[in-house]
């Protein structure tokens, strides 16, 4: 019995051992099969990743460490901890990273594809154009710009702080910069002043004195790195937050001031040519100034008026153009317009009174670290002639003048500009084809303003004209001065305000009536208003009128005893409350409540103010025909 029990016990142990062996063998076989599958998959993945083609025979050299990594096996690579550059979820210690919000999708710019309709076709005006590229004329229908010009909204024209072209940007809607923190809503009664000389006129008697029409100063707070390479005086380089005022004057000199104190920041530049227009700075922050003279030089040699590109590193002239251009039709070489620069294509856009539009590929080479700048210009010219434009061989009373004295507005790839002969033209800058023309009746000197309105950001232009004696009426009479809102897509008039009939004084003391100063478009609490200075409404009087953008009706108007050739400047306080600054022939600068037209303050500057002010925060800079430049603080 005992033997039988021992035998059963031994048999039971043997069965358990055999079962254990079977189970172990089973698991070993399973593990071997799985490992084989994993190894095969791993090799296939590695081979495909190395060659990009599993069937490729090409031998790929492995980077250092890759062979060792492969030896670690598929699981090691599969579960290897990734760094944040690989997946953006964990840092190199394996800790979760904070989730970054996605970049917002940029809002696409509204399309702008202008075209003509009945009454705005260029052919209705007998418009003819020609193009010259690098000195050779070409078929106007064959021209296409090598680099596409495409401007954005006016407020994106530059990242610089200040007012760097006439009325600030390509919409011509920003003659002031920053915020005017006013408590008293008054002019400070202790302005700084600087005396400017004069220059004998080339033709006739008298002299060009002080600052004339349009005469706006340029205001800029240069980046500190740019100041360091300029020929500024040491104290100016060291003054933190310096606001530099740059003023091209009719004395033939370009002056540089501290806008807060009137102290000269550097030596003036002498050119021997009188400047009426504002000039312009480069929107990219390059130390370049673009400026053209308003008359021929009476100095020794009696040189012809033209335009300059000046280095503001050392005051040297880098390039001159427009002098007795053989491509011109009209004999004048004056430049009262204020230029614009397309930053992306490095293109200077400069209209002239000769009737030529200059598009200059600058090929700028600026090395701030080395303190050097150079240009290698490539010039394209466009000119026009309409059926009613006269030429040098036709008396002025028998035909309207060629040429552009106002400053161009640009939106996307199209420029809108008026001329001396009663045309408002929309020009495609990439093909130099005229898209539409609107009749402005007379010699048009004012610079309009471009706005985008409504939910669809539809573009409009506000524009008016002047009264040139003997074209529409004799100089002893008056002529209508309409104010228009114009659809920038088609050139059609949206509304017309016909409130004004103006006079003009003939030569030798010619004073043109109508709108000579430029429009101001309200923003913030003035958003629905447009401001227009009208001259010679009754004798030497004039008005500043605020019109509703929607329909052209009058919101308010104020009558001056002296006409306003100067342009209105809106300024805004920290709450968006808007005020209007307006200067006049009587020598006064006025401050108005922009919504109501209430006169808040005025100051006598001593002589005729044809020039337009520019404002940086609380600091106004303005010049007079009497030869003084003023720096006035709003308080």
Task: Mark where each language-model region is.
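N-terminal Lys/Arg-rich, disordered targeting/topogenic segments
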Residues: 1-20
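Hydrophobic membrane-insertion alpha-helices, especially the h-region
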Residues: 24-39
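N-terminal, intrinsically disordered, polar/charged segments of Gram-positive cell-envelope systems
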Residues: 44-120, 124
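Extracytoplasmic/lumenal domain signature
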Residues: 101-152, 173-213, 218-291, 295-335, ...
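Conserved oxyanion/phosphate-binding beta-strand-loop segments in alpha/beta enzyme cores
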Residues: 170
């Amino acid at each position: 019995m005992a033997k039988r029990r021992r035998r059963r016990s031994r048999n039971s142990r043997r069965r358990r051992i055999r079962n254990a062996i079977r189970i172990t063998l089973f698991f070993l076989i399973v593990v071997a099969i799985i490992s084989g599958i994993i190894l095969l998959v791993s090799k296939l993945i590695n081979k495909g990743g190395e060659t990009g083609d599993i069937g490729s025979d090409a031998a790929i050299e492995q980077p250092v460490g890759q062979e060792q990594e492969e030896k670690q096996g598929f699981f090691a690579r599969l579960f290897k901890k990734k760094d944040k550059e690989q997946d953006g979820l964990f840092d190199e210690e394996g800790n979760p990273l904070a989730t970054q919000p996605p970049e917002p999708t940029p809002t696409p710019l509204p399309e702008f594809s202008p075209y003509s309709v009945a009454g705005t076709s260029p052919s209705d005006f007998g418009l003819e154009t020609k193009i010259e590229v690098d000195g050779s004329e070409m078929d106007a229908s064959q021209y296409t710009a090598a680099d596409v010009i495409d401007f954005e909204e006016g407020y994106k024209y530059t990242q610089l702080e200040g007012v760097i072209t006439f009325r600030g940007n390509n919409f011509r809607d920003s003659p002031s910069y920053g915020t005017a923190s006013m408590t008293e809503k008054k002019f400070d009664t202790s302005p700084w002043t600087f005396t400017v000389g004069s220059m004998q006129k080339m033709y006739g008697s008298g002299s060009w004195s002080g600052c004339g029409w349009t005469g706006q100063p340029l205001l800029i707070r240069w980046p500190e790195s740019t100041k360091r390479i300029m020929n500024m005086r040491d104290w100016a380089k060291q003054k933190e937050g310096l606001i530099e005022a740059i003023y091209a004057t009719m004395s033939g000199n370009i002056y540089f001031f501290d806008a807060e104190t009137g102290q000269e920041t550097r030596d003036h530049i002498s050119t021997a040519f009188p400047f009426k227009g504002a000039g312009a700075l480069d929107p990219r922050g390059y130390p370049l100034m673009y400026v053209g003279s308003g008359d021929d030089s009476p100095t020794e040699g009696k040189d012809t008026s033209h335009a300059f590109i000046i280095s503001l590193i050392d005051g040297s002239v880098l390039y001159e153009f427009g002098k007795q251009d053989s491509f011109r039709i009209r004999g004048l070489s004056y430049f009262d317009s204020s230029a614009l620069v397309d930053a992306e294509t490095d293109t200077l856009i400069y209209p002239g009174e000769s009737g030529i539009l200059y598009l200059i590929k600058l090929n700028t080479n600026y090395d701030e670290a080395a303190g050097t700048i150079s240009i290698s210009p490539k010039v394209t010219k466009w000119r026009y002639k309409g059926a009613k434009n006269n030429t040098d061989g036709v008396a002025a009373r028998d035909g309207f003048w060629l040429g552009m004295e106002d400053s161009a507005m640009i939106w996307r790839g199209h420029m809108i500009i008026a001329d001396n002969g009663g045309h408002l033209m929309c020009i495609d800058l990439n093909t130099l084809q005229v898209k539409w023309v609107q009749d402005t009746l007379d010699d048009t000197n004012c610079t309009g303003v471009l706005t985008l309105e409504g939910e669809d950001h539809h573009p409009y232009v506000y524009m008016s004209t002047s009264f040139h004696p003997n074209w529409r009426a004799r100089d002893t009479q008056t002529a209508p001065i309409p104010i228009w809102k114009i659809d920038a897509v088609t050139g059609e008039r949206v509304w017309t305000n016909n409130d004004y009939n103006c006079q003009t004084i003939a030569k030798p003391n010619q004073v043109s009536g109508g709108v000579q100063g430029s429009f101001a478009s309200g923003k913030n609490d003035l958003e629905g208003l447009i401001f227009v200075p009208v001259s010679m409404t009754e004798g030497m009087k004039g008005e500043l009128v605020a019109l509703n953008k929607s329909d052209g009706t009058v919101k308010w108007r104020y009558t001056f005893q002296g006409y306003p050739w100067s342009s209105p400047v809106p300024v805004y306080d920290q709450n968006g409350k808007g005020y209007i600054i307006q200067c006049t022939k009587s020598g006064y600068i006025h401050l108005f409540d922009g919504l109501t037209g209430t006169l808040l303050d005025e100051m006598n500057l001593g002589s005729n103010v044809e020039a337009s002010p520019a404002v940086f925060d609380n600091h106004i800079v303005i010049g007079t025909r009497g030869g003084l430049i003023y720096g006035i603080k709003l308080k």
